Amino acid sequence: GPPVIKALRSKTSLPFDVHLMISPVHKYIKDFANAGADIITIHPEATPNLQESIDEIRSFKKKVGISLNPDTKIDIVEDYLDKVDLILIMSVYPGFGGQKFISDVLEKIKSLKNLKDKKKLNFDIEVDGGINFSNFKSVIDAGANVLVSGTTIFKENNGDIKKNIDFLKSI
């Protein structure tokens, strides 16, 4: 939570992208922003008013992300695409690491990328969940430009983190 972000903030200049899978999310935005988060990603289902939550994040001069669960349709956030810095597409159901990638989200990524290009918008398309060596390229080819790959980075090749990151960068 915020104490961890605050403790680590002075140790690195790398951006902290926090994905708040909590409800009601508006109760926590201020704490994460003040702790040093750079990007705050929220679920539309976790706020009574998505626009107010976006405005609150912006009031702290932070970047805004909206996360879509595997079953959440893109059209729920279409009116907000020009107000965000990233859309995070979950390719597993939130809750725990190590789940299998849900391949149906590839079509959602493609649709979001097409919508982004059609409207000439500027936001990152991030994908989180089940990202591994075998699906990494297909996720990029579908239109994602930010990928979260926790389990693969820490567990493949006997946990050789550098080797795993280097391999993913080479794809």
Question: Which ranges hold each PLM region?
Answer:
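An active-site metal/cofactor-coordinating segment within enzyme catalytic domains
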Residues: 1-22, 31, 92
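Charged helix-capping and loop-helix junction motifs
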Residues: 1-6, 101-108, 163-164
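Structural motif corresponding to alpha-helix initiation and N-cap regions
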Residues: 1-2, 22-26, 47-51, 71-74, ...
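Conserved anion-binding
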Residues: 11, 15, 27-28, 37-124
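Structural motif
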Residues: 19, 23, 43, 67, ...
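Catalytic cores of alpha/beta
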Residues: 26-34, 72-84, 129-147
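C-terminal helical cap(s) of enzyme catalytic domains, especially alpha/beta-barrels
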Residues: 57, 140, 154-171
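Acidic, Mg2+-coordinating phosphoryl-transfer loop and its flanking beta/alpha structural elements
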Residues: 145-149, 153-155
